[in-house]
Swiss-Prot record:
Family: Belongs to the universal ribosomal protein uL3 family.
Keywords: Ribonucleoprotein, Ribosomal protein, RNA-binding, rRNA-binding
Sequence intervals crossing the membrane: none
Subunit structure: Part of the 50S ribosomal subunit. Forms a cluster with proteins L14 and L19.
Protein name as annotated: Large ribosomal subunit protein uL3
Functional summary from the UniProt entry: One of the primary rRNA binding proteins, it binds directly near the 3'-end of the 23S rRNA, where it nucleates assembly of the 50S subunit.
Cellular component GO terms held in the UniProt record: cytosolic large ribosomal subunit
Source organism per UniProt: Bacillus pumilus (strain SAFR-032)
UniProt-annotated stretches for the region Disordered: 118-150
Highest taxon, organism lineage: Bacteria
InterPro entries: Ribosomal_uL3, Ribosomal_uL3_bac/org-type, Ribosomal_uL3_CS, Transl_B-barrel_sf
GO terms for MF: rRNA binding; structural constituent of ribosome
Disulfide bonds: none
């Protein structure tokens, strides 16, 4: 069954394995999440648990938000997400979800929002090849064919310059190197999407081998 938790990306560091290998890891701080709601097939048409992370200031919360978390007897949360495929019987409204639901060696998928890069050209944004830079060429870093005579238009899906980054990215099959339950930390092998202090979702892998 699916397990998951919300947290913040703290940054990257490295740890030594028992055999002496140096492992680059991303540190994710996942303070206690709270189960806000259990969704069932009878009432909602599908099964899921709704979890919240990071308390929101009282004056920034509206009445519906305060009423929604009243059953869980907690403060309104800044980040609220649903986890489908979870075992509903294992959770109760108001229950805290901590990092100890995972163990060392677990394989997880991590979802975050990629760093924004601003307005970028087709080469950086889409990985296109550039044209010749010398020998009289006047085609260097442009997008390419943009509407020849016959179709007399630009085709849908043409890779063009534009805003790059700031998209939801999921990196699959990452290994949890260490679970630090005392400090609410997960050390995940490799890098995960997003800037420092950005929100990430860690849940059990859907394609784990």
């Amino acid at each position: 069954m699916t397990k998951g938790i919300l947290g913040r990306k703290i940054g990257m560091t490295q740890v030594f394995a028992e055999n002496g290998d140096l492992i680059p890891v991303t540190v994710v701080e996942a303070a206690a999440n709270v189960v806000l709601q259990k969704k069932t097939t009878d009432t909602d048409g599908y099964e899921a648990i709704q979890i919240g992370f990071d308390d929101k200031r009282e004056k920034l919360s509206n009445k519906p938000e305060k009423g929604h978390v009243a059953k869980a007897e907690t403060a309104p949360k800044r980040f609220v997400k649903e986890l489908r495929g979870a075992e509903l019987d294992a959770y109760e409204v108001g229950q805290e979800v901590k990092v100890d639901i995972f163990a060392n060696g677990d394989i997880v998928d991590v979802t975050g929002t990629s760093k924004g890069k601003g307005f970028q050209g087709a080469i950086k944004r889409h990985g296109q090849s550039r044209g010749p830079m010398t020998h009289g060429s006047r085609y260097h870093r442009r997008p390419g064919s943009m509407g020849p005579v016959d179709p007399n238009r630009v085709f849908k899906g043409k890779l063009l310059p534009g805003r790059m980054g700031g998209e939801q990215i999921t990196v699959q099959n990452l290994e949890i190197v260490k679970v630090d339950a005392e400090r609410n930390l997960l050390l995940i092998k490799g890098n995960v999407p997003g800037a420092k202090k950005s929100l990430v979702t860690v849940k059990s892998a859907v394609k784990s081998k």
